[in-house]
């Protein structure tokens, strides 16, 4: 009971000295907690007080025979090291005075340390530079310190933001008018409202910002940098480093890339290959003749596929099905002769396109081309005589051109006769098809030529009027009629004139006419 009365008497004395600054509470265990906000002793000059703290002393039920536990809260202007040393010194003094009242002695000791340390520690949180002697700084009501000029610039910027915020609130029609938001400039550290004189702050001199000298790179730093560089390279190789620029361009599509050549792409059709070969420019007569020869081969190959498809559809009796590649590819005789004549005409074109400087060169070139032409036509003379009984004119073959004009005339004559030969060759075939002999032999004597194949239907695939897509065929007709591509027994309406025009168009495309 005597110990408790001693504690109560000591607390009453402290309350009479520090008045309202002292805060005393009693806990459930019978102990007491005494706390006090301390400032430096500056003769009550609040503007000169740059540091402060809250000293808390916890007393147990055994006090004063046990030392109180001392803690510091809410420090301002003091560094961590300073606070740690202050707490240790007070705790040591309390342990030395065990058995006697020590609260007043601890409070005064802490106030003395604050007075000695009444210099703001740390740096200005606005400019991040330390405080130096001669610089003008300001202490706020929350005991935070700034250079006066830095604080003035901060307040100016904050006021501009507040005006923008007020304008936004006025334009906002959805906000509640009853709840007005209080806008004020706050401390950049603790967000407590500030009281300030803006003109006085801006008139203060700006702090001197020293330039940081270039650090001297030592050997240890270089070694460390090399080791880190190796780690960086290893991480890049394993994909551990993300490059923002490379990731942003990862799915970027470049439109300036060269187009893909269709002729180099596998799986393309023959027609696409022919179109790509036709689009390529030629730089010499040899390349021109080579390109034309490849085009002729593609052109000669396409009718063969069409002809074979017609045969398959004719065999089925219904032409609406899709025919695949034929099993037996038999070349047509007219197509072979046409390809040979086109090759001979291409050679004449290459001879005409060459430079002619003298008359002797022209004559020698023409004679050489005439000899080649006579050899080619000699090979074709026998089948043409047996099938058509109309051989090629000997006067035209034996005549020797004397200049480029005669060579071109000879080419035109040959082209016309080839056209007429193919036209005459197609008429008997069409007559045989038109009669519609339902049970006639496929190897009948009506076919001309000992090598005429049963699949060959003549040049009718050039005529659009007799399309092979109709139901029925040349060998099997539904009604026993004579129509080639029709179901009924009507006559075939495809005229020779239309076919002649069609053949001439094909020859003009190939460069014969």
UniProtKB/Swiss-Prot annotation:
InterPro entries: RNF25, RWD_dom, UBQ-conjugating_enzyme/RWD, Znf_RING, Znf_RING/FYVE/PHD. Zn(2+) 2 binds at residues 142, 144, 187, 190. Residues 345-397, 406-423 have a biased composition (Polar residues). GO terms for biological process: positive regulation of canonical Wnt signaling pathway; protein ubiquitination; rescue of stalled ribosome; ubiquitin-dependent protein catabolic process. Zn(2+) 1 binds at residues 124, 127, 147, 150. A zinc finger (RING-type) spans 124-191. GO terms for molecular function: ubiquitin protein ligase activity; zinc ion binding. It catalyses: S-ubiquitinyl-[E2 ubiquitin-conjugating enzyme]-L-cysteine + [acceptor protein]-L-lysine = [E2 ubiquitin-conjugating enzyme]-L-cysteine + N(6)-ubiquitinyl-[acceptor protein]-L-lysine. Its main location: cytoplasm. Residues 271-297 have a biased composition (Low complexity). Residues 261-513 are annotated as: Disordered. Pathway: Protein modification; protein ubiquitination. Residues 9-117 form the RWD domain. It is found in: Cytoplasm. Belongs to the RNF25 family. E3 ubiquitin-protein ligase that plays a key role in the RNF14-RNF25 translation quality control pathway, a pathway that takes place when a ribosome has stalled during translation, and which promotes ubiquitination and degradation of translation factors on stalled ribosomes. May also acts as a positive regulator of the Wnt signaling. This is E3 ubiquitin-protein ligase RNF25. The gene is rnf25.
């Amino acid at each position: 009971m005597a110990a408790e009365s001693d504690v109560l008497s000591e607390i009453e004395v402290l309350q009479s000295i520090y008045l309202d600054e002292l805060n005393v509470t009693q806990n459930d265990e019978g102990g007491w907690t005494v706390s006090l906000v301390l400032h430096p002793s500056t003769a009550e000059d609040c503007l000169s007080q740059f540091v402060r703290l809250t000293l808390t002393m916890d007393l147990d039920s055994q006090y004063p025979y046990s030392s109180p536990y001392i803690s510091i809260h809410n420090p301002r202007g003091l560094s961590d090291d300073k606070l740690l040393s202050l707490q240790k010194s007070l705790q040591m003094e309390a342990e030395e005075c065990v058995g006697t009242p020590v609260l007043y002695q601890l409070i005064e000791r802490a106030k003395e340390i604050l007075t000695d340390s009444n210099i703001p520690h740390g740096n200005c949180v606005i400019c991040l530079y330390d405080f130096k002697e001669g610089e003008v700084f300001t202490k706020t009501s929350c005991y935070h310190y700034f250079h006066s000029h830095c604080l003035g610039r901060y307040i100016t910027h904050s006021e501009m933001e507040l005006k923008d915020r007020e304008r936004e609130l006025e334009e906002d029609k959805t906000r509640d008018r009853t709840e007005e938001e209080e806008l004020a400039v706050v401390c950049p550290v603790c967000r407590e409202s500030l009281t300030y004189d803006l003109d006085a702050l801006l008139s203060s001199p700006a702090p001197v910002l020293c330039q940081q000298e270039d650090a001297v790179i030592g050997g240890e730093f270089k070694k460390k940098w090399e080791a880190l560089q190796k780690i960086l390279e290893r991480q890049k190789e394993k994909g551990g480093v993300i490059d923002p620029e490379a990731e942003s361009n990862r799915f970027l599509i470049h439109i300036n890339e060269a187009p893909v050549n269709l002729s180099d792409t596998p799986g393309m059709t023959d027609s696409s290959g022919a179109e790509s070969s036709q689009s390529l420019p030629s730089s010499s007569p040899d390349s021109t003749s080579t390109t034309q020869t490849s085009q002729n081969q593609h052109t000669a190959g396409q009718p063969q596929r069409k002809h074979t498809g017609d045969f398959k559809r004719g065999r089925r009796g219904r032409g609406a099905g899709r025919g695949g590649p034929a099993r037996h590819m038999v070349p047509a005789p007219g197509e072979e002769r046409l390809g040979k004549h086109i090759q001979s005409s291409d050679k004449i074109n290459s001879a005409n396109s060459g430079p002619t400087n003298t008359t002797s060169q022209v004559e020698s070139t023409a004679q050489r081309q005439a000899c080649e032409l006579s050899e080619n036509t000699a090979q074709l003379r026998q089948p043409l005589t047996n099938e058509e009984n109309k051989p090629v004119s000997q006067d035209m073959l034996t005549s020797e051109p004397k200049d480029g004009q005669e060579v071109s005339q000879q080419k035109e004559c040959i082209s016309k006769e080839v056209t007429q030969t193919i036209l005459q060759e197609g008429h008997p075939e069409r007559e045989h098809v038109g009669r519609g002999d339902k049970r006639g032999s496929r190897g009948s004597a009506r076919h001309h030529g000992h090598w005429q194949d049963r699949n060959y239907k003549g040049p009718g695939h050039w005529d659009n009027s007799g399309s092979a897509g109709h139901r029925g065929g040349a060998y099997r007709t539904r009604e026993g009629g004579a129509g080639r591509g029709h179901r009924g027994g009507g006559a075939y309406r495809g005229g020779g004139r239309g076919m002649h025009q069609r053949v001439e168009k094909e020859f003009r495309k190939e460069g014969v006419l």
